[in-house]
Amino acid sequence: MLVINSCRAASRLALRSLNLRSPIATRTFSTGLALKTKDVVNITFVRANGDKIKTSGKVGDSLLDVVVNNNVDLDGFGACEGTLTCSTCHLIFKTSDFEKLPDKPGDEELDMLDLAYELTDTSRLGCQITLSKDMEGLEVHVPSTINDARAA
């Protein structure tokens, strides 16, 4: 019992001497997460009929994540949940935006895009596009027909 009481007393003394304003304490209690205002990108999805859906996503999320996380009403979009097996997250980019995308499509994505309706030279799968801060204000077009390549 004496040992327990002396441990408690030592703990209290250590807590009293802890300076919560010290850099070490600040780092210890910091989450390490970026501020929301710095890691959010505004995006507009344009339906084939011209209707615009404005939403936002976190830097590092895919365009598929943005649709799912914000409950964007795009019927059938992302049926395979980003496993590169369906082409339902087919999106069409403006040429200027397409050229700025950091990664070029891989063979698997190109194979899926071959099965997509309304394919263009600036088509990509939303599950393969990762948001970055320089995509702020991005506007992407959703084809009028969504094709699930798994049904082919």
From Swiss-Prot:
Binds 1 [2Fe-2S] cluster. SUPFAM superfamilies: 2Fe-2S ferredoxin-like. Residues 1-29 form a transit peptide. Disruption phenotype: RNAi-mediated knockdown results in larval growth defects, strong larval lethality and strong reduction of ecdysteroid peak level required to proceed to pupal stage. RNAi-mediated knockdown in the prothoracic gland results in larval growth defects and lethality at the third larval stage, with a complete lack of pupariation. It holds the Pfam family Fer2. It is found in: Mitochondrion. One of its GO terms (molecular function) is metal ion binding. This is Adrenodoxin-like protein 2, mitochondrial. It comes from Drosophila melanogaster. The gene is Fdx2.
